[in-house]
């Protein structure tokens, strides 16, 4: 094959297929066919929805025409309305006909396009089959030619060997005839091998040179075997008309609300440069790292011939969607019992008696300030999971969460105190959650105990106990003496048996966060009650806006466990942040899924906060600023040991205040007080309230240097009372008036350098020089001010008693007449407090 085969002279031409010659080392070259990519024609699918013709509003009742309209005018208007309706219906029919014609035209074009594509595919298939048949015939012909050449060479060598044998000396024939024949056979085999070697073109394709080729002047390397194969492949593809090219794979591309250009190219399996080029054709100058909207990305995907699958950002949570468990997979689980009731009614003491442990001794002031989660095994071998909720008014959200994750509510009511506000709240939480209730009447060992009054008071809140012919079980107990505890456990076991509680332990775990805190040594720690499945060490999970991998599981006894099944409360270590109490924990298959879900939830929460804090109009912003001018604020920072306590404190702070003063929580968090907190408090002039936490050494030093006040509390209502007292100091004092006397004007005198002086008789109380006065004429106040002088017998006096005469002159006022009455009063400031 010559070097000039298939080449033409250079010339100017458009973008058409051509050849490019590439040069390689050792003198090798390669021709590359450059083809122009044909643009894919996207034909819209038939069956597009037709726009509905808008209907005109119905005509009004002719009988109900406005006053002053004549019959002729009314008739003219009706005719005009009918004509308008007729025109509108004609236009609608015309539009429908045009739309129908356009749809038929689109259908015809689509059918033509499909027929054209079908014919093209059939032609390509025929060309492919024809090329394959020709290739097969060519190979057979080449093999047959090789076999014929070998046979011809063998036939030509046989006569030559015979003639050589005949020319040999006759004397040598009888002695070495056999050896001569063997030599001839070896020569024949050597000749055949040489012939076959020549058939391989002397190693041309392998690129090797022999000594004979060098001496004959046949220098230079020839085309390699790989180059020959590539040439044959190109020829075969050319014969098949390019149909052997790999067919394009149509992909379903998932398209979110916004996507990065490089990610879009990756999902389509296309080159990023091609995607950027298409965007530039659409007038968008973007780079591969920029984000484009979903509509633009959809046009790009359709341009490349792929299918669009629209997805939402919230679809990332589909991987943790709840799965219905099969009935055969469900197994019995322990009941979850929440103990609720008013503060100091003995809830923790009752649980203490059941657990036979002194839980209440560790609570500050004997008041539960966290949700305690415990597991108790009864004498009968049954396992019960208890949640002990706080009873203080500030812990409303904690009690609500306790009712939402429980199976049975034990309502503790003190026999000597009856139904109290938090008792009513606990009843409402239990009803809202739809869980059964058991009433435990505690403190029956006290002399003033009255269980009957408790049962009667419960009737006011639609709680009818069995003793009153109702359905709610009630048990009289004493946490102090242990009386009635067995009956209470029997009632709980009976109620749990009625509920038939089951769960599937062989599925990914799902649970609720009862409490969360930031531990100094262990990091973020969450107390989780497992509701479904089994949580194991090493599981990857997402909880609220946080995610993590289970590093350790610790049960209620402080022991490390490897797994936790349904209805088991455990502490989970391994979070990347502190979750909110009440968040749901879900186990995911990969860390990427968990991180994506957590980031999506965090973004949603951020958007909600931004939307809530944004003022919609300038007028609203100005009105809010004007309203805030008259309101005094007490800024504080709150740091607590657990998330639930911080939440309860913030809610309690929101309830403190009135129209004149309010408490503003600048920041609330979990964990020790840090230098960052001190810096924020100094900038805002706010004190730091620490609840069961302390400031570290650097924070204490910084606070002392900057004069920031840090207060520590262990009982929540002590904190609330102190903040309430501090907020009360911002209230303006209340001015009260005390009436101290009355005086009647008998005569009016004019005194030089003084003006008019009233001669008065004090009829009631006392008249003081420093007091305020009002002038009454016919029981109407005509002046209010102060006294310029108060004299008795030409002497200036401080006060005049009842029944005595005196002279009075008003400050900057002279319109006094005989018969007027002077009212004397004093003002005092009274300090106000917040209730």
Curated annotation (Swiss-Prot):
Family membership: Belongs to the TRAFAC class translation factor GTPase superfamily. Classic translation factor GTPase family. IF-2 subfamily.
The keyword GTP-binding is annotated on this UniProt entry: yes
Biased segments, Low complexity type: 43-67
UniProt lineage: Bacteria, Pseudomonadati, Pseudomonadota, Alphaproteobacteria, Rhodobacterales
Superkingdom, natural source: Bacteria
Residues engaged in binding GTP: 341-348, 388-392, 442-445
GO cellular component term of the entry, any: cytosol
Principal cellular location given in the protein's record: cytoplasm
GO MF annotation, one: GTP binding
Compositionally biased residues, Basic and acidic residues: 85-147, 157-166, 175-205
Domain tr-type G: 332-500
HAMAP family: IF_2_B
Residue span of region Disordered: 1-243
Region (G2): 366-370
Source organism of the structure: Ruegeria pomeroyi (strain ATCC 700808 / DSM 15171 / DSS-3)
Keywords: Cytoplasm, GTP-binding, Initiation factor, Nucleotide-binding, Protein biosynthesis
Compartments in which it is found: Cytoplasm
Protein name: Translation initiation factor IF-2
The keyword Manganese belongs to this UniProt entry's keyword annotation: no
Chain spans, region G4: 442-445
Region G1: start-end pairs: 341-348
Region (G5): 478-480
